C-alpha cells in the first residue's frame, strides 16, 4: 500500500485545514490505503495561540486581540478549535508557536530554497518545522515530513516587502 509521511506541519488559525488533513488521513487508514496516521503539528503565531493553549491545557479560552504578520492565522475565536485539538492529540502530534520574525525568515528561506512564495501564514508551517528540527529529538533526522505552505505570497505582500532593502537610485551622469 501507500505510506503516509511521518509528520505534517500545518499553519493553524481556525483549525479547519488541520482538522481536514486529520480527516483525510483517517479516511485513508479506514479504507486500508495507509497503515498509520502521520503526526500532525499545528503551528501558530506566538500572538495568536488559542489552539496551542487548548491542546496544552485542555481549557478553551478566546484570545483578546491577536495580531501577527500572518494575518490569515490571526484568530481570536477559532471555529474548529475542538477538532484541531483532537487532530493533534490523536496523532501524537504537537503544537508549535513561532514569532513574526521566525515566520518572515521562513518565508524568505522557503522562497530561496524552493521558489515557493507563500504568504506569511503559509510560511508559519515551515517556521514550525525549522523550530522543531532545532529542538532535541522531536523528529528523527530521516523523518519524511510534509509542510503545507498555503496561500500565495502576493495575497499578503506588505510584510515581506518591509524586509526588502531597495538600493538607492543612482542619478545618470551622461
Task: Identify the residue ranges that each predicted region occupies.
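Active-site/ligand-binding loops adjacent to catalytic centers
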Residues: 2, 27-117, 162-174
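Glycine-rich ThDP/TPP pyrophosphate-binding loop and its adjacent helix/strand module
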Residues: 3-16, 20-23
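Conserved acidic residues
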Residues: 6, 40, 143
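Short beta-strand segments
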Residues: 10-13, 41-44, 147-150
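Short glycine/threonine-rich catalytic loop with a Thr-x-Gly-x-Asp
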Residues: 12-16, 80, 114-122
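Buried hydrophobic packing segments
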Residues: 17-25, 107, 125-132
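Short helix/loop capping segments that flank catalytic or ligand/cofactor-binding pockets
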Residues: 19, 51-52, 156-158
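Phosphate-binding loop/pocket of nucleotide- and phosphate-handling active sites
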Residues: 35, 62-64, 124-174
Amino acid at each position: 500500500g501507500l505510506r503516509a509521511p511521518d509528520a505534517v506541519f500545518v499553519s493553524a488559525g481556525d483549525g479547519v485545514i488541520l482538522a481536514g488533513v486529520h480527516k483525510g488521513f483517517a479516511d485513508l487508514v479506514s479504507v486500508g490505503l495507509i497503515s498509520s496516521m502521520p503526526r500532525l503539528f499545528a503551528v501558530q503565531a506566538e500572538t495568536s495561540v488559542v489552539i496551542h493553549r487548548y491542546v496544552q491545557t485542555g481549557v478553551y479560552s478566546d484570545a483578546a486581540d491577536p495580531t501577527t504578520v500572518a494575518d490569515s492565522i490571526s484568530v481570536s475565536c477559532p471555529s474548529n478549535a475542538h477538532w484541531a485539538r483532537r487532530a493533534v492529540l490523536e496523532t501524537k502530534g504537537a503544537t508549535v508557536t513561532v514569532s513574526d520574525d521566525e515566520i518572515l525568515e521562513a518565508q524568505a528561506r522557503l522562497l530561496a530554497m524552493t521558489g515557493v512564495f507563500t504568504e506569511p501564514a503559509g510560511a508559519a508551517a515551515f517556521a514550525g518545522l525549522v523550530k522543531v528540527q532545532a529542538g532535541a529529538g522531536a523528529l528523527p533526522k530521516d523523518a519524511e515530513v510534509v509542510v503545507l505552505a498555503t496561500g500565495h505570497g502576493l495575497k499578503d505582500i506588505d510584510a515581506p516587502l518591509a524586509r526588502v532593502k531597495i538600493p538607492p537610485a543612482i542619478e545618470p551622469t551622461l
